C-alpha cells in the first residue's frame, strides 16, 4: 500500500515522501497514529496544499523537543526496586516505570518515547535512549538500586552486588581451634 508520510518515520522516510508499505503496518500504525495518508490523487493534492503548514508544525514540534532535550540530556534518575543477592530484580523496569519517574521530575515524556529492546532486570546504572521527536534523541541514565544509599554508592561507581568478603580470623576465631572443637564433639556423639 502506498502512503504519503506526514512526518519523518525512522527506517522508512522523510516527511512528504511516498513510500510503499505493507497494508497492516499502514492501517494499524501509520494511518491510525496520523503519521501518513493513503497515496490517492486527492490526498496528494491535499498534502501539497497543506505542506507548508505541516512543515511549520513539524519545525515547531522539533524546536519544543530540542528545548526539552537540552534539559533532559545526561540527566540521571533513581528507581528503588527489590532484588536478590545477585542483583537480579524481582520483576523488571519497563518504559512505563521510566516515564513515571521522569514525569515526577518535571519532564513531559511518554512511555512510547523510551527505546528499550527489553525490560531492565538488573541493578545498576543503565543508559536509556529517549526519542523526543523523530529528529531529536537524548540519553538518560537510570540508577536502579535497593535503597537510596545504595543508589548513591552506585553513582560513585561502587559495585553493590559483590558479596562482602570477610576472613574468619578477622572475626576473632581461630579456625584450627574451632574445627578441632567441632571434631571432638563429633567423636563424643559416636
From Swiss-Prot:
The keyword Ribosomal protein belongs to this UniProt entry's keyword annotation: yes
Record's keyword terms, sorted: Ribonucleoprotein, Ribosomal protein, RNA-binding, rRNA-binding
Lineage top rank: taxon: Bacteria
GO biological process, one term: translation
InterPro entries the UniProt entry points to: Ribosomal_bL9 (IPR000244), Ribosomal_bL9/RNase_H1_N (IPR009027), Ribosomal_bL9_bac/chp (IPR020594), Ribosomal_bL9_C (IPR020069), Ribosomal_bL9_C_sf (IPR036791), Ribosomal_bL9_N (IPR020070), Ribosomal_bL9_N_sf (IPR036935)
Gene Ontology terms for molecular function: rRNA binding; structural constituent of ribosome
Keyword Thylakoid tagged: no
GO CC field: ribonucleoprotein complex; ribosome
UniProt cross-references to HAMAP family, sorted A to Z: Ribosomal_bL9 (MF_00503)
Purpose of the protein: Binds to the 23S rRNA.
PANTHER family cross-referenced by the UniProt entry: 50S RIBOSOMAL PROTEIN L9
Homology family: Belongs to the bacterial ribosomal protein bL9 family.
Protein name listed in UniProt: Large ribosomal subunit protein bL9
Native source organism of the sequence: Methylorubrum populi (strain ATCC BAA-705 / NCIMB 13946 / BJ001) (Methylobacterium populi)
Lineage: Bacteria, Pseudomonadati, Pseudomonadota, Alphaproteobacteria, Hyphomicrobiales
Gene giving rise to this polypeptide: rplI
